[in-house]
Amino acid sequence: AMLATGAACGTSDDSDASASKSSSKSSELTGYDVSGVKKDDAIAKMLPDYVTKDGKLTIGMDTSYAPAEFLAADGKTPVGFDVDIAKALAGVFGLEADPETANFDSIIPAVGAKYDIGISSFTVTKERLEAVDFVSHFNAGSAWAVKKGNPNKVDTSDLCGKKVAVQTATMQETAANKMAKQCKADGKAEMDVISSKLQTDVTTNVVTGKADVFYADSPVAGYAIAQTDGELETLGKTEGIAPEGIVVKKGDQQMDEALQKALQKLIDDGTYMKILKYWGVQDGAISKPEINTPGTNE
């Protein structure tokens, strides 16, 4: 969950993260095969002309955020559960999916012009809803991860004296810095916040013992843990769960409703859950996509 108007989840606007230094294991994944998704003529007819005229569904995404959207081993092909959902939606619309890599904070302003939609782990917030529409498609929160067995006896209710790894420019970094200040104010042992641009480095810091615990978006944490082959485990429950959504041009009711119907179809026929299970993020599944509905903790 990212800060500012640009970011939700995802990294900062630093594009070197887009060079995706994902582990060799993660880069082997090519995505769930959605080629069997059939066009639904009734839903396709709901689309506005600007979307259908070139036969493509153009999607803006910051491909530096495994497992939602990142680059495959070739360094060019976008993969991830958001990518697969976008491809499946394009299938329902009878369009060709055209995912394009973009800096995170450039996506929202370009939806409706350069891109038909944006899918990039955007948390649905009241602030963002002033600029664009959203169709919710996933739920994410924040999660903690430690070495298996929690050898350093990390207690997330008191992290004073611990080393906490986070990704730069995330809401988790802000939260960790706030906790560190509180430790100091209370005269307790110092909490060390170790911030890295890439989540892969955040994970490595805990694996190697440089940090005691990391704090990240729940799907990112779950995926990162899976890549360590059992070296790490989650600590406690997912916190602060909020909806993520597909970005649509402000006030484009036709597109909002077409996406809502198409996504509901993919949920009802099981395609949506198969995609999430492929990436190990089924805990974030929703049953009903909603238009312009921010999280309750907003």
Residue ranges, per PLM feature:
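Periplasmic-binding protein-like
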Residues: 138-146, 226-264, 282-298
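Ligand-binding clefts/hinges and TM-proximal coupling segments of bilobed small-molecule sensing domains
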Residues: 30-49, 174-193, 264-298
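A ligand-binding cleft/hinge motif common to bilobed small-molecule-binding domains
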Residues: 122-129, 177-178, 207-240
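Extended ligand-binding regions for polar small-molecule ligands
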Residues: 10, 25-41, 91, 150, ...
